[in-house]
Structures are given as structure tokens and as C-alpha cells.
Amino acid sequence: MSLALYTCLLWLCTSGLWTAQASTNESSNSHRGLAPTNVDFAFNLYQRLVALNPDKNTLISPVSISMALAMVSLGSAQTQSLQSLGFNLTETSEAEIHQSFQYLNYLLKQSDTGLEMNMGNAMFLLQKLKLKDSFLADVKQYYESEALAIDFEDWTKASQQINQHVKDKTQGKIEHVFSDLDSPASFILVNYIFLRGIWELPFSPENTREEDFYVNETSTVKVPMMVQSGSIGYFRDSVFPCQLIQMDYVGNGTAFFILPDQGQMDTVIAALSRDTIDRWGKLMTPRQVNLYIPKFSISDTYDLKDMLEDLNIKDLLTNQSDFSGNTKDVPLTLTMVHKAMLQLDEGNVLPNSTNGAPLHLRSEPLDIKFNKPFILLLFDKFTWSSLMMSQVVNPA
């Protein structure tokens, strides 16, 4: 299937609602009602976060955030979280939306065999609060989540419990969520995701070398730089000045590495949209390249209240929220935290796999070095969910 066709699926499910039956016209039409009217939800969210901290690494998982917002809407008297994701509740029922997220979660876990991905939501509430049984049953059924009672008055102990729970759920990959709470809360939702993949064409660890990464005009850091040569999907964009390549993971994961021209990061980020991805997909062609990509691990933590205040759902995270469908104790003050972690390395070498193409090719390859700030977009090709979006400013 071509990247252009995949882009059509992205148009239908930027917020992550697509099913295995999407290949048929009938099923496709049935899911158009679930597709958000704002198909650029993921890009808008990403662009906002980069604008807040343009000189820092940015990492989010749009599909994980979408699931968290949909889960919180269960039983809530307000529907702005679903509407902000683009759902028309006059055409699609809330039950259908939650069933689709349930199926999406299943598809991601079943289809991404080449990705080590731990994604989920954990709820923590005051010991004296009582959530309704119907709400607890729904979050477990649709989102495989649970609610744990802790003592927020002893915040040191409470934060340790939260961190340990997420550490256990991610098999030790995410060890720390947060230590401070900016404002009092009676209900904390932690949305987390860890991702690491196996490249379809893995890098050879023997070729990894220490090289310079130019953070800005005055700052340079040393990073382990992975190297391989071969035929890779490539495009040089003169309209939105950048170079980009696409690399697949084993299974259904795929990654777009986007290298803006000097001083053009803001221009390229502002141009990210469904139409831009569609255009790139049509113009990308295989090219012999010498590819240099830094090996790194980055993580980011966000207060969703700060992230979502421009998406018309900030009332969900304030004292004005009505969670009468969720708890017998209202009003309820909600804090939502998003924690994302990405590990990018050579990838485990599978039996019978090759460690990239030889470093010396007959034709003269193009050198592409990601040795300055770049953009990284990770998708699931089967559902075309936005797994990760990142601006990598300093991989050291």
C-alpha cells in the first residue's frame, strides 16, 4: 500500500479511530462518522506545545492523549472532550466512540508486534471519594484502566505510589512521573506511553560512532550517531524547506524523520498538516543514501490542563467540571498528566535480518545527517494512529 493511500487513512483517523475493516468501502463509510471534523487535532496539539518551548525537546503521543480524554468523558455530564476530538455526537453515539477506542487499543497491541509499547491510563483518587461502579466498569472494559485510592495529604508518599505504579505498568521503563503537584486535586489521571521499536532494516551497532550534534549556533554536544546506507524513501521539499526520510519498524510502525533547513524549523512545523503529509507521500521516492541518525532516549511530562486550554475543553480540568456521572462526591477536581518516553536505538537484530546495507555502494549515495534539531513523527500503518510526535532539539 502506498504512502499516499496511508495518508487517506490518516485523514480518517488522526485521533486514532480506524478499524481492521477500513479497507472496504462500506466499513470506511461507517467510520467517517467517528472521524474528527478537526482532522489536524494531533498536529495542532503538537504545534502548540512546540510554540510554548521552541528551544526544548517536545514529545507527545496524540493517540494516547485522545484515549485519556475519551475515558474521562465516561459518565461526565459534559461532552466537550469528545467534541474537541472532532466527534459529532448527533451522528455518533458516545457508546460507539468508546467501543471504537476499545477496538483501537486492541488493534495497536495486536498489530504492533515489532514495537515495544506500554500505553495506558491510571487513576488515583482521594481515599474518601467513591467512584460509581458503572464508571469503574466502563473504564475497565473500554480502556483497561483502574482507580486506586491514595492519601493525597501525604503527597511525598502519594507521589511515590503513583511513580511505582507507572513503573510497574511499563516494566520499569518509566520510573518517574512527577514529584510536585501545582494545585490540589482529588482525582489524578496519569496517561503514559513508552515506545521502542525494531527497525525493519536495523542499524549495525558496529557502525555507531560519536559525532557532533549542533543544538544551535553556539551549542554543540557529542552523541552516538547510528549509520547505515541503502535505499530509503526520501524527499527534498523546496516549498517547506526540509529533507525527510521514512523508515519502517518491523510490524506496522513507521517513522518520518524531517530535517528542516537552517533556521526553518518554525516554518516546517507550522506547515505540518494532513495536506502536507499527503503531498510528501506523493512525492517521496526511494533514494540511495548514507543516513546518520542519533541514538537517544527522551521523555516528557505535561499537565494536560496547559496543553488543552486552547482546544475548548479546559473546563474539564477545573472546579467547574461536572463528574456527577462518575462519583457520588461532587464537585471533583481533576488533574491530568501525560508522560511519554521514546527510545531510539539500532534496534534488536532479528534472526536472518541484515544490519542495513553495505556502507559502500556502487552509485554515489546522498549524505543525510540528522546532526541538528529535527522533527520525528511515528505512526501505526495499520490504524494510522499518531503514536508519537517529537521535536528533537538536544538528543544528548
From Swiss-Prot:
InterPro entries cross-referenced by the UniProt entry: Serpin_CS, Serpin_dom, Serpin_fam, Serpin_sf, Serpin_sf_1, Serpin_sf_2
Effect of P36A: Increased affinity for corticosteroids
Binding site for cortisol: Q246, D278, W384
Sugar-modified residues: N88, N216, N252, N319, N352
Site note Conserved cysteine within steroid binding domain, residues: C242
Free-text tissue specificity from the UniProt record: Expressed by the liver; secreted in plasma.
Main location class: secreted
Result after altering F256A: Loss of corticosteroid binding
Signal sequence segment: 1-22
BP term (GO), one: glucocorticoid metabolic process
PROSITE patterns attached to this UniProt entry: SERPIN
Keywords tagged on the record: Glycoprotein, Lipid-binding, Secreted, Signal, Steroid-binding, Transport
Outcome, altering R32A: Loss of corticosteroid binding
GO terms under cellular component: extracellular space
GO MF terms held by the record: serine-type endopeptidase inhibitor activity; steroid binding
Protein localization: Secreted
UniProt cross-references to PANTHER family, sorted A to Z: CORTICOSTEROID-BINDING GLOBULIN, SERINE PROTEASE INHIBITOR, SERPIN
Description of its domains: Proteolytic cleavage leads to an important conformation change. This reduces the affinity for steroids.
Role of this protein: Major transport protein for glucocorticoids and progestins in the blood of almost all vertebrate species.
Family assignment from sequence similarity: Belongs to the serpin family.
Name the record gives this protein: Corticosteroid-binding globulin
Organism classification: Eukaryota, Metazoa, Chordata, Craniata, Vertebrata
